[in-house]
């Protein structure tokens, strides 16, 4: 066989001509979504058929690898147009049509991933091609396709392949239904004004009033978190916490059990002992034993800190019960946690979150945040007035490289809750930044979706400090999408190892704990005054408040995830309750089933929730080694970060990117110090007022 016709030298590099076209559209009817889904499947299948039916002697880079890469670019964009509206469209009909499209396309994805004929031709190409004739990223793409083929069992007997295909299709549908149930949940609880004691006026004014005069509290984040933090009526907190962790209890509990069973079956067919081992093969951690050791060691280090914090909380509860004439049961309940953790911030660190949020109107935060990111990463953002989107609240921005003026991408901001909308905060990649069929560069487009408190007649949207942190985090993912310069869609943006994917955006959370960035994105919504420096200093000092309990809870969630995907007979609710008691020291509320509300289990983080903590090892190392040492707003370090960490996307291993940015292998020291733990004789001392 001759060497492939299109080799390394023929492929365009990052300096390729750039196409600034936004191919996305959001005006499709439910019928059009259905029709376009069918058309997309037919068009894409034709390409796979052409690749899979070619004679082996005709297999070349152009006819096989490039053909698959090109169709992936088109397919990804068109698929996102069809399946993204299920998360954000204000129309229930559109959301339903989009969900159905996602199900059909997910089934089609499984069919295409199980094409043994295509796999055989990719293997043939690898055996015949001269390795040095491929550009490094093309070689990586070829290797990845073969790896994915083996992970789908395409080297196994046909009967086994059919079993795997059947399981994969069922898993896709179950995951879609699990998260659809949560998105469409409309549960609310009615309360009197007295039952909502302790909540600020702007919160109460934002609640819908019912015919009987009671106020309607939903289980969406802008209602749930403020109430759990500030309502001084324990019974109200109990009802809301219980309802929140009983959402979709029956239907999602059944789905979760089936998910866990099917994942285990598929993994065994592929020769893996557990689903966790199957998933982790592609991650930095590699094995479930490595993850278990990481979580166990961290839990052991954090437990003494958690015990101290529980003692403080219990004393706060005793004092409050005495002050309000309430019975004191001598125990911390699940509905007490956020309330008294908030009190720790207010009493030990003198941070009044209600006062603080008056300095974080969303427009001021947005302006400051965008300014910091532009300065740090050498970018310039421009708001596109009147751009079409899926809702009137949504804003579209263009991002350019500040030095060259070249467009690097676009991003949508969709910040406020709506009925039926995705209920958390997330970044959705909508158009991958990669090379098109003609060698020109397609710009990346992403959407940041959040659920911040909506403006009222009396006040703009005011953000809690933890919402500002969330904003910084998710926008970090947006920047990862836009700044990557991969050649292949498969490696664009955040397509890195799952236990590294959070590190770039976690690293950027540090800016909301630094004085200069905080001053730049805050201003009192009435007076326009800056945050008093004393309040700012107390906020920064409060970063380590409750760090033991917060991180022990993260370990609980990670361990639940690992348990479900290493022990198929584990009962999700029982496992969660056991770990809450053992690790956190706070029992789960009887009758609840938190895992049935845990969207990560059906949202691509199966056996990988540990990645949030694992990624922090790298995010803290990057921040303290470079930015903290050389300046948190140092644009040279920012450009190094853009070049070394964001630019490659998934075209390199994360370990190689980290070594290049840090100048050495990563270390855990900064991570442990950030958790309030002693490292080499240094122990951070939280300051109190």
Swiss-Prot record:
Please give the residue positions where the record annotates the modification Phosphotyrosine: 278
Domain of life from the UniProt record: Eukaryota
Q: How is the cofactor bound?
A: Binds 1 zinc ion per subunit.
- Main location, first listed in the record: cytoplasm
Q: Which residues carry this modification: N6-acetyllysine?
A: 257, 538
Q: Where does Zn(2+) bind?
A: 473, 477, 480
Cofactor annotation: Zn(2+)
Give any GO molecular function from the UniProt entry: metal ion binding
Q: Which reaction does it catalyse?
A: Preferential cleavage of bonds with hydrophobic residues at P1, P2 and P3' and a small residue at P1' in substrates of 5 to 15 residues
User: Is Cell membrane given among the entry's keywords?
Assistant: no
The UniProt entry annotates the active site at 474
Entry EC no(s): 3.4.24.15
Query: Which cystines does this chain contain?
Result: none
Record-linked InterPro entries? MetalloPept_cat_dom_sf (IPR024079), Neurolysin/TOP_dom2 (IPR024077), Neurolysin/TOP_N (IPR024080), Pept_M3A_M3B (IPR045090), Pept_M3A_M3B_dom (IPR001567)
Q: What are the BP-aspect GO terms?
A: peptide metabolic process; protein polyubiquitination; proteolysis
Q: For this UniProt entry, which segments traverse the membrane? A: none
What class does this enzyme belong to in the EC scheme? hydrolase
Please report which protein family the annotation says this sequence is part of. Answer: Belongs to the peptidase M3 family.
Protein purpose: Involved in the metabolism of neuropeptides under 20 amino acid residues long. Involved in cytoplasmic peptide degradation. Able to degrade the amyloid-beta precursor protein and generate amyloidogenic fragments. Also acts as a regulator of cannabinoid signaling pathway by mediating degradation of hemopressin, an antagonist peptide of the cannabinoid receptor CNR1.
Subunit-level organization: Monomer.
Name listed for the protein in its UniProt record: Thimet oligopeptidase
Which organism does this sequence originate in? Homo sapiens (Human)
């Amino acid at each position: 066989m001759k060497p492939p016709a299109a080799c390394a030298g023929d492929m365009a590099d990052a300096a390729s001509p750039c196409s600034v076209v936004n191919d996305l559209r959001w005006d499709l009817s439910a019928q059009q979504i259905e029709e376009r889904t069918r058309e997309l499947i037919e068009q894409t299948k034709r390409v796979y058929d052409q690749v899979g039916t070619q004679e082996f002697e005709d297999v070349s880079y152009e006819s096989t690898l490039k053909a698959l890469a090109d169709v992936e670019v088109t397919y990804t964009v068109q698929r996102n147009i069809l399946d993204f509206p299920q998360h954000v469209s204000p129309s229930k009909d559109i959301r339903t049509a989009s969900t159905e499209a996602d199900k059909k396309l997910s089934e089609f994805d499984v069919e295409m991933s199980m094409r043994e004929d295509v796999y055989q031709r990719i293997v043939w190409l690898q055996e015949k091609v001269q390795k040095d004739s491929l550009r490094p990223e093309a070689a990586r793409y070829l290797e990845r396709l073969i790896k994915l083929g083996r992970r789908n069992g395409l080297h196994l007997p046909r009967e086994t392949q059919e079993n795997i295909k059947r399981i994969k299709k069922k898993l896709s549908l179950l995951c879609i239904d699990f998260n659809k149930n949560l998105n469409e949940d409309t549960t609310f609880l009615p309360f009197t004004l007295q039952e909502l004691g302790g909540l600020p006026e702007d919160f109460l004014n934002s609640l819908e009033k019912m015919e009987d005069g009671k106020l309607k509290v939903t289980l969406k984040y802008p209602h749930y978190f403020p109430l759990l933090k500030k309502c001084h009526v324990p019974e109200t907190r109990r009802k809301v916490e219980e309802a929140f962790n009983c959402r979709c209890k029956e239907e999602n509990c059944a789905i979760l059990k089936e998910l866990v069973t099917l994942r285990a079956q598929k993994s065994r067919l592929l020769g893996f002992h557990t689903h966790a081992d199957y998933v982790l093969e592609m991650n930095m951690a590699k094995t479930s034993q490595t993850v278990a050791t990481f979580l166990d060691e961290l839990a052991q280090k954090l437990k003494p800190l958690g015990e101290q914090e529980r003692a403080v909380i219990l004393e706060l509860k005793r004092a409050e019960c005495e002050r309000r004439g309430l019975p004191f049961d001598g125990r911390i309940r699940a509905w007490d946690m956020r309330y008294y953790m908030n009190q720790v911030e207010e009493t030990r660190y003198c941070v009044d979150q209600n006062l603080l949020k008056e300095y974080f109107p969303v427009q001021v935060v947005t302006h400051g945040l965008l300014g910091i990111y532009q300065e740090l990463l050498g970018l310039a953002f421009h708001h596109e007035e009147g751009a079409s989107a899926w809702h009137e609240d949504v804003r579209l921005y263009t991002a350019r490289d500040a030095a060259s003026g070249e467009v690097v991408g676009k991003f949508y901001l969709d910040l406020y809750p709506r009925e039926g909308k995705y209920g958390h905060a997330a970044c959705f990649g909508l158009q991958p930044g990669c090379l098109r069929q003609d060698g020109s560069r397609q710009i990346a487009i992403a959407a940041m979706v959040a659920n911040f408190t909506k403006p009222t007649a009396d006040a703009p949207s005011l953000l809690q400090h933890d919402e500002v942190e969330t904003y910084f985090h998710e926008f970090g993912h947006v920047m990862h999408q836009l700044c990557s310069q991969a050649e292949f869609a498969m490696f664009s943006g955040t397509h890195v190892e799952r236990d590294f994917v959070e590190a770039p955006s976690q690293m950027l959370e540090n800016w909301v704990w630094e004085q200069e960035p905080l001053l730049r994105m805050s201003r009192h919504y009435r007076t326009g005054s800056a945050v008093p420096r004393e309040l700012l200093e107390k906020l920064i000092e409060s970063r380590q408040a409750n760090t033991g309990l917060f991180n022990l809870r993260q370990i609980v969630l990670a361990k639940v995830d690992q348990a479900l995907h290493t022990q198929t007979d584990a009962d999700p609710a029982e496992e969660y309750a056991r770990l809450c008691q053992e690790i956190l020291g706070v029992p789960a509320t009887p009758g609840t089933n938190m895992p049935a509300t845990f969207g990560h289990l059906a949202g691509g983080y199966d056996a990988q929730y540990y990645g949030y903590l694992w990624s922090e090892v790298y995010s803290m190392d990057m921040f303290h080694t470079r930015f903290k040492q050389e300046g948190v707003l140092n644009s040279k370090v920012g450009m190094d970060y853009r070049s070394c960490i964001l630019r490659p996307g998934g075209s390199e291993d994360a370990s190689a990117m980290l070594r290049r940015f840090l100048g050495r292998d990563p270390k855990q020291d900064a991570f442990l110090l950030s958790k309030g733990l002693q490292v080499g004789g240094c122990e951070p001392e939280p300051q109190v007022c």
